[in-house]
């Protein structure tokens, strides 16, 4: 009985309570996460209660949060009402997502000034991932606050035990000399992004240095396709993971270097606006053979000269990605 009485008193207090104190601060805080967008405005803007404000004019999902009204777009993919009227467009190489918080009172007369808090989140589509990877595990996921977001922190390169790409090899990844020519399975994966975004590998190459622009390099993937027939691209642009395999190799005539660094230009593709899967014409892929030994062209941009090195240690094709370095003994 006491509990019921207290509950009724709370209801009556709310019923007779006056409107909130108007706040005329034109401020909006925007947090652009890889999958979610959160916005905050000062509570009681120009006298409006939180239940009178709608995200995109659709979602009345505002909550009180320490002096602010907070609104959330839980997923950047338009499904049901979770998208909350968010609009998007692609202006190469940036994705733009924009929406607004608007007043939407259904009463006969309105005494508060209408409000419209517009906001935008932008995300780059292209990333060059080239960190040393064999001594580093999956990249730590973090986000950047503000009006500009990034997908880069969600990208990582993993090594797998076989072509099923189900079992990840632990770092550090070491290739023994006796394993030169053996299959290596790799995948660039994006975690925590909306399902609408697919991972596309544009170009992948290997260098004997951590510098992605090092003059000695070997191409693995060019314009989304395998550089030769010994490299197999399993998936590219179909899911949140792009996978491929190649034969382990080492660079010749490179003294005092035992590491191979991998680099990939990675594109995050919006499958709701574009066709993301990469289609390759195998007739355009060429492989040179001399006496059954593969010949690889390595550009050595030294004084404008270009030289060729012969890799006689078995199939010499590697080059993968996004900053993981294989230690070859």
Curated annotation (Swiss-Prot):
One of its GO terms (cellular component) is extracellular space. Residues 19-287 form the ZP domain. It is found in: Cell membrane; Secreted, Extracellular space, Extracellular matrix. A lipid is attached at residue 304 (GPI-anchor amidated glycine). One of its GO terms (molecular function) is extracellular matrix structural constituent. Disulfide bonds join 204-264. Keywords: Cell membrane, Disulfide bond, Extracellular matrix, Glycoprotein, GPI-anchor, Lipoprotein, Membrane, Secreted, Signal. Glycans are attached at residues 80, 104, 116, 145. It comes from the Eukaryota. Residues 1-17 form the signal peptide. It is a lipid-anchor; GPI-anchor. The N-terminus is blocked. N-glycosylated. Exclusively expressed in the inner ear, where it is found in basilar papilla, clear cells, supporting cells, cuboidal cells and the lagena macula. Residues 305-329 form a propeptide. InterPro entries: ZP-C, ZP-C_dom, ZP_dom, ZP_dom_CS. Its main location: membrane. Zona pellucida domain may enable to form filaments. One of the major non-collagenous components of the tectorial membrane. The tectorial membrane is an extracellular matrix of the inner ear that covers the neuroepithelium of the cochlea and contacts the stereocilia bundles of specialized sensory hair cells. Sound induces movement of these hair cells relative to the tectorial membrane, deflects the stereocilia and leads to fluctuations in hair-cell membrane potential, transducing sound into electrical signals. May form homomeric filament after self-association or heteromeric filament after association with alpha-tectorin. This is Beta-tectorin. It comes from Gallus gallus.
């Amino acid at each position: 009985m006491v509990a019921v009485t207290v509950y009724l008193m709370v209801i009556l207090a709310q019923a007779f309570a006056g409107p909130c104190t108007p706040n005329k601060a034109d401020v909006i805080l925007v947090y652009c996460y890889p999958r979610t967008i959160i916005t905050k405005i000062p509570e009681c803007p120009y006298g409006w209660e939180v239940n009178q404000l709608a995200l995109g004019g659709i979602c009345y999902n505002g909550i009180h949060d320490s002096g602010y009204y907070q609104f959330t777009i839980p997923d950047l993919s338009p499904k049901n009402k979770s998208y909350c009227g968010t609009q998007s467009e692609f202006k190469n190489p940036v994705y733009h997502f924009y929406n607004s918080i608007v007043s939407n009172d259904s009463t006969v007369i309105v005494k508060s000034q209408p409000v419209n808090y517009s906001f935008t989140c932008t995300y780059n589509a292209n990333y060059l991932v080239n960190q040393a990877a064999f001594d580093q595990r999956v990249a730590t996921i973090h986000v950047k606050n503000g009006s500009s977001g990034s997908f880069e922190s969600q990208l990582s390169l993993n090594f797998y035990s076989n072509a099923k790409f189900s079992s990840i090899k632990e770092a550090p990844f070491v290739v023994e000399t006796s394993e030169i020519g053996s299959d290596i399975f790799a995948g660039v994966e994006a975690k925590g992004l909306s399902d609408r975004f697919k991972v596309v590998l544009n170009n992948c190459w290997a260098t004997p240095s951590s510098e992605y622009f090092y003059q000695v390099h070997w191409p693995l993937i060019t314009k989304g396709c395998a550089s030769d027939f010994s490299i197999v691209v399993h998936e590219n642009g179909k899911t949140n993971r792009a996978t491929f395999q190649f034969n382990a190799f080492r660079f010749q005539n490179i003294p005092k270097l035992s590491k191979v660094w991998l680099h990939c230009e990675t594109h995050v593709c919006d499958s709701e606006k574009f066709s993301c899967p990469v289609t390759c014409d195998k007739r355009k892929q060429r492989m040179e053979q001399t006496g059954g030994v593969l010949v690889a062209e390595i550009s050595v941009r030294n004084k404008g000269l270009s030289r060729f090195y012969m890799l006689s240690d078995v199939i010499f094709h590697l080059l993968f990605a996004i900053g993981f370095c294989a230690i070859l003994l």
